[in-house]
Design a protein with these regions (language model features):
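Acidic, His- and aromatic-enriched active-site or binding-groove loops in soluble protein domains
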Residues: 204-207, 243-254, 273-277, 317-333
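Substrate-binding cleft of extracellular glycoside hydrolase catalytic domains
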Residues: 167-171, 176-255
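Alpha-helix N-cap and loop-to-helix initiation/capping positions
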Residues: 152-156, 198-202, 231-234, 267-278
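Substrate-binding surface in catalytic domains of secreted glycosidases
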Residues: 254-292
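Sec-dependent bacterial lipoprotein signal peptides
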Residues: 1-18
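Active-site beta-loop-alpha junctions enriched in small/polar residues
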Residues: 140-142, 184-188, 226-228, 255-257, ...
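Aromatic-lined carbohydrate-recognition surfaces of secreted/lumenal glycan-active proteins
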Residues: 227-232, 288-306
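Alpha/beta catalytic barrel-like cores
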Residues: 20-52, 56-200, 317-319, 333-383
Length: 383
């Protein structure tokens, strides 16, 4: 383990994460989604609560002193998702300090913390996570107001995404980066529409156009559903022909889900774990029936009430669930919201949204800053 006669101690201590509840920290907000002005007509077991999350041993604690430290104390372990140098809180502690260390004659102890956040299914062959970081441009080509995907001319937007992905690759050379287009395929509306569901479904032609942009470049496509006064059960099936393609994945936006019948945009909406589990089972069946690699399911969140029963979200290796913190504000406010809505309610993987409009994110966090979050996000979205 080192030079000379060293001493080693294997230590592991479980760190409990708070599963739910409020926080005195402020929470970031995000703008409401404006109406698109276009005429475009094997069940798994529920996930264990965070306090039951699996832990892995802390790495060997090495002492280079010739004196054996018989009073060494276990080092506290903080839970995290991956044993990876990419985690926001450094995997290598500078030193382990204990009030009794001066009695041992031992040199400063180097500690490597292995974080587990939480226990996720072992990735199946072809799974994107955790070995890939997805960099996505969000929006709708029919609106300049919904995000960067529709704000620029298509070729300009695609070139910009490619360059953005390159910057992320430089920020973390240990994780492969792949670009993605995140299309709002079902857009919540202030107007009720013909069926009074307060949502507008994009035509197959519009979805196909964006799909071809992604497929031609070997990128990913995410289809985002804002159900309005509809439901996930109503909206998901029509997208299955697209989701049957290996490069197409799913996203759900609770902000615009109005189970109480409110008009989207007048209040922050909500989805329950039951909605997420339905989507997950549907995708898992599609993966099995069509022989596909695992799907990614992104769920947006910037308040705790946007997603109820998070600890009841099932774990199925065929579907990798990402909780995407999509609030805006200063870096301090975004980190506080991250702590409350992601870090304290672990599901599987994590995502982080960045708003290019300086009125929303001020200043815009850099890739180097974002990769230091813990757990380090695997999904990054620009709006």
């Amino acid at each position: 383990m080192g030079r000379g006669v060293g001493c080693a101690v294997i230590a592991a201590v479980t760190a409990a994460l708070i599963a739910c509840g409020g926080s005195s920290r402020p929470q970031a907000t995000r703008p409401t989604s404006p109406t698109v002005m276009a005429k475009d007509t094997v069940r798994t077991q529920p996930a264990a609560a965070p306090s039951d999350s699996a832990t892995r041993p802390v790495a060997t604690v090495a002492c280079d002193s010739t004196h054996r430290d018989s009073s060494a104390v276990p080092v506290k372990e903080v839970a995290a998702h991956e044993n990876s140098p990419r985690t926001g809180r450094s995997a290598k502690a500078k030193a382990a300090r204990h009030p009794h260390h001066h009695h041992t004659g031992c040199a400063p102890i180097k500690v490597k913390l292995v974080r587990v956040w939480p226990a996720a299914p072992t990735p199946l062959p072809g799974a994107l996570l955790p070995n890939t970081r997805i960099i996505a441009f969000y929006g709708n080509p029919l609106s300049t107001r919904l995000g960067v995907l529709g704000r620029m001319a298509p070729q300009v937007m695609l070139d910009s995404l490619a360059k953005t992905a390159e910057r992320w690759q430089l920020a973390d050379t240990t994780t492969k980066v792949i670009p993605a287009l995140h299309l709002i395929a079902t857009v919540a509306q202030g107007h009720p529409g013909a069926d009074r569901k307060h949502r507008l479904r994009m035509s197959d032609e519009t979805i196909e156009r964006v799909a071809q942009w992604a497929q031609a470049r070997g990128w990913l496509l995410f289809l985002d559903i804002q159900v309005g006064q509809s439901t996930v059960r109503e909206e998901l099936p029509r997208l299955l022909p697209f989701l049957a393609r290996p490069y197409v994945h799913l996203a759900l936006d609770p902000e615009f889900a109005m189970p109480g019948g409110e008009i989207p945009g007048t209040r922050i909406g909500t989805l329950d774990a039951a909605d997420i589990n339905y989507a997950q089972r549907t995708l898992a069946k599609l993966v099995t029936d069509s022989g596909l690699p695992p799907k990614v399911l992104v769920v947006h969140r910037f308040t705790t009430k946007m997603l109820t029963g998070a600890h009841q979200i099932e774990r199925d290796a065929r579907v990798q669930v990402v909780i995407d913190m999509d609030g805006f504000g200063t870096p301090q406010l975004k980190r506080a919201t991250w702590h409350v809505t992601v870090e304290r309610e672990p599901v599987q993987y994590t995502g982080f949204k960045l708003f290019l409009n300086p009125r929303n994110d001020h200043p815009l966090m850099t890739p180097e800053q974002v990769v230091q979050l813990w757990p380090s996000p695997h999904y990054i979205q620009y709006q």
